[in-house]
Each structure stands twice: as structure tokens, then as C-alpha cells.
Amino acid sequence: MNATSAIQKLLDELERLPGIGPKSAQRIAYWILNEDRVDATRLAQAIIEVKDTVHFCSRCFNYAQDELCDICASPKRDQNTICVVSEPRDIPPIERTGTFSGVYHVLGGALSPLEGIGPDDLHIAELLARLNNPSVAEVILATNPNIEGETTASYLARLIKPLGVKVSRLASGLPVGGDLEFADEVTLGRAIEARREL
């Protein structure tokens, strides 16, 4: 696309988004250009607002607008069961299954020696601190079923088992090498229900 500098700047920024290539960036840019100013401003303000008001939950490291995320703050959630995920984006697919009523702990990634990500780079110490609460009965390891996720789950299981807390892993059925955010609700729901103890 032969573009003015302002349009090119928009295209360059859109292409930085995950999954957005040149053609998608061009479609989005044309949509923005063709929308009235009110709609474009509303989009820009929503982006600024989310960057200004959303931070990490002080307990589980999910996204939150208050000190605690909505899940941690809910009296309806089972605080005795903690589901450990790699990233905040892994929570919505699990929530959509309607089969999990516990709380979460977001690690902020997965162990990956090749990328220089070790235990100190993740929220593992905070998870272990949460397990000092004697009411915690089970930890479900819901890291991605890839090499990094399996390595992280094995490492966590070795740390948690001696604490006397039941440790389980999502059952197979999720594709190996896949990511939770792309799993359908039925497959993910069955994986939660058929989780196995480690």
C-alpha cells in the first residue's frame, strides 16, 4: 500500500500486534479511516484506559482493576483449589468450560532454559507462599502441553508434593505442542474433569 506517513505509521503499529500481517493491518487501517471520528476516538480511549487502569492481581497475577481480580475477590469461588496457568490469557478458555470453580495462579510464563527463563523469573515463590494456607487442598497444573509447559509442570509437582497438597495435571486430550487459548471448550472441559494426580 502506498501510504501517507500517518497511514504508514498506523500500519507499522498494527503489524506489531500478534497475528496481524500486512494485509490484516491494511484492512484494520482502512476500517479506522472509514469510521467516523467518534468511533476511532472510542477505540483509542479504550486502549489508553486499559493501559492506565489494568494491572496484575496482588494474589494470583491475573489482570485486575482493583487489588484483587474478580475471581480472587469472589466469595463464590473455591479457594481450596488453585489452577496454575502460564499466562492470564489461559484463564478465559478454562472459565468458558464452566467446570472449574476454584481460583488461579498465573506464573507469568514457563520454564525455558533456551530462552533464559528460570524459576526465579516466574511467580513460583508466590505460589508456594499461597500453599502455606492449610485450606489449600489441590493444585491443578494447567500449563500448556508443550515442552516448556511439561517441564514447568514437572518442576512444580516436585516442589508441591512434599507440602502434602494434592497435585494434578490436565488430562490428555489437549494437543501436544498446542496452547490453551486455542482449545475448544469441550476438549478443555474434559481435560479438566479427567485431570490426573502427579
Regions picked out by a protein language model, each given a short descriptive name:
Residues Q8-D12, Q26-Y30, T41, Q45, ...:
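Solvent-exposed alpha-helical segments within well-ordered globular domains of core cellular machineries
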Residues A25, S74-I140:
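Extended interfacial segments that mediate partner engagement and assembly in macromolecular machines
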Residues L128-I140, N144-L198:
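Long C-terminal interaction/binding lobes of large macromolecular proteins
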Residues P18, R37, V50, N62, ...:
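Conserved phosphate/pyrophosphate-binding and hydrolysis machinery centered on Walker-type P-loop NTPases
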Residues N2-Q8, R16, Q26-I91:
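Cys/His-rich Zn2+-binding cysteine-cluster or related metal-binding knuckle/ribbon modules and their
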Residues E13, L17, E35, V50-T53, ...:
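Conserved, well-folded catalytic cores of nucleic-acid-processing
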Residues R27-I28, R42, H55, E67, ...:
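Residue-level signal for pocket-adjacent positions within structured domains
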